[in-house]
Each structure stands twice: as structure tokens, then as C-alpha cells.
Amino acid sequence: MTEAPAEFPPEDETPPRGPGDEWVIGILRELREEALKHFDPRLLTTLGNYICARHGDTLESARELINVLQRALFVHFRAGCKISRIGQTRGETPFSAIPTPRGMQ
């Protein structure tokens, strides 16, 4: 009796995909660097702590933080960020109609 040949999955010529975890973490790092140019670091730290408390230290929390940072940066750019090429050229923000609270001028 002959021994059956070992079975191997077919080899395709495509390069193996990297884990999605590394991609998500890379995107989060890029967004964090960009967000630090536009927002107060204390705000970003508080946001990160809130999301980690809500979702735990998981990939889901990283995805949620990416989602929130993308939205915040989008609104910030659309409001007329002075250091960005993206956004309105008028110079006014939609928040200029809101009066500044006393003691914050």
C-alpha cells in the first residue's frame, strides 16, 4: 500500500495580505498626527480615553476613534481652517454667529 500524498492548499502568485490590525493602527497614527496640528492635545486625549472606556482597548475602539477624527477634521476643514488648503476661502466659520462665553475672550 502506498501512502497518500500530503495535501497543500493551492499556491497563488499574489503577495500575502498584511493583517488588518496593522492597517487600522497605521491609519490611526496618521490621523492622530494630523489632528494634533488642528486640535488641542487635551481634547484628543479626553476623546481617546472616552472611546477606550466605552469600547475597551480593542480594534473596535481604534475604528471608532478613526471615524470620529475623520468627521472632526472634515468639519474643521469645511469651517475654513487657516492652515489647510481644503475648506472655504471666506475666512469666517459657521460658529462665528455664536457669542463667546463671558470670561473666554
Swiss-Prot record:
Keywords: Activator, AIDS, Cell cycle, Host G2/M cell cycle arrest by virus, Host nucleus, Host-virus interaction, Modulation of host cell cycle by virus, Phosphoprotein, Transcription, Transcription regulation, Viral penetration into host nucleus, Virion, Virus entry into host cell
Entry keyword Ribonucleoprotein: no
Domain of life where this protein originates: Viruses
Signal peptide: none
Gene3D superfamilies linked to this entry: 6.10.210.10, VpR/VpX protein, C-terminal domain (1.20.5.90)
Localisation per UniProt entry: Virion; Host nucleus
Cellular compartments per GO CC: host cell; host cell nucleus; virion component
Keyword Cell cycle attributed: yes
A single GO BP: symbiont-mediated arrest of host cell cycle during G2/M transition
Phosphoserine modification, residue list: S84
Positions of the UniProt region annotated as Disordered: 1-21
Primary localization class, coarse: virion
Function: Stimulates gene expression driven by the HIV-2 LTR. Prevents infected cells from undergoing mitosis and proliferating, by inducing arrest or delay in the G2 phase of the cell cycle. Cell cycle arrest creates a favorable environment for maximizing viral expression and production.
Record text on subunit structure and interactions: Interacts with human UNG.
Protein name: Protein Vpr
Organism encoding this protein: Human immunodeficiency virus type 2 subtype A (isolate KR)
